[in-house]
Amino acid sequence: MLQPKRTKYRKPHRVSYEGKAKGVKEINFGEFGLMALDGAWIDNHQIEAARIAMTRYMKRDGKIWMRIFPHMAMTKKPAEVRMGSGKGNPEKWVAVVKKGTIMFEVAQVNEQVAREALRLAMHKLPIRCKFVKRGEN
């Protein structure tokens, strides 16, 4: 699964996913992309499931770029544990996705195949998304 090799801090503060994206707002590598219409924390399993769905539909033709990576550890305390006594242990790795972020890019396939592959990926993600073309957004 996707996770960083090393982190400076084991238990980071929870970064907000409210507001608009600052960095990854345009398609830079491929011809078509998947843009987030909401903000959310997307975990490594969801990113991997979306990638596998696209790869299988395209039958390994074309090229896929993942523009998000789960850098942040989410912590959770065990069930039925009283409050206090420190922060919980790292449970999963998440990517902070804000509104307008391009999450995946696809190239070297026609638009119909790209649209269907990205539609399948949308169903694996917990947020609303839309299909965009290069230069359109």
UniProtKB/Swiss-Prot annotation:
Record-linked InterPro entries: Ribosomal_uL16, Ribosomal_uL16_bact-type, Ribosomal_uL16_CS, Ribosomal_uL16_dom, Ribosomal_uL16_sf
Pfam family, one: Ribosomal_L16
Organism lineage: Bacteria, Bacillati, Mycoplasmatota, Mollicutes, Mycoplasmataceae
The UniProt record lists the keyword GTP-binding: no
Example GO molecular function: rRNA binding
Function: Binds 23S rRNA and is also seen to make contacts with the A and possibly P site tRNAs.
PANTHER family documented for this protein: 50S/60S RIBOSOMAL PROTEIN L16, LARGE RIBOSOMAL SUBUNIT PROTEIN UL16M
Keyword presence, Membrane: no
Protein known as: Large ribosomal subunit protein uL16
GO cellular component: cytosolic large ribosomal subunit
Coiled coil: none
Keyword entries, A-Z: Ribonucleoprotein, Ribosomal protein, RNA-binding, rRNA-binding, tRNA-binding
GO biological process terms on file: translation
Assembly behavior: Part of the 50S ribosomal subunit.
Membership in a protein family: Belongs to the universal ribosomal protein uL16 family.
Top-level taxon of the source organism: Bacteria
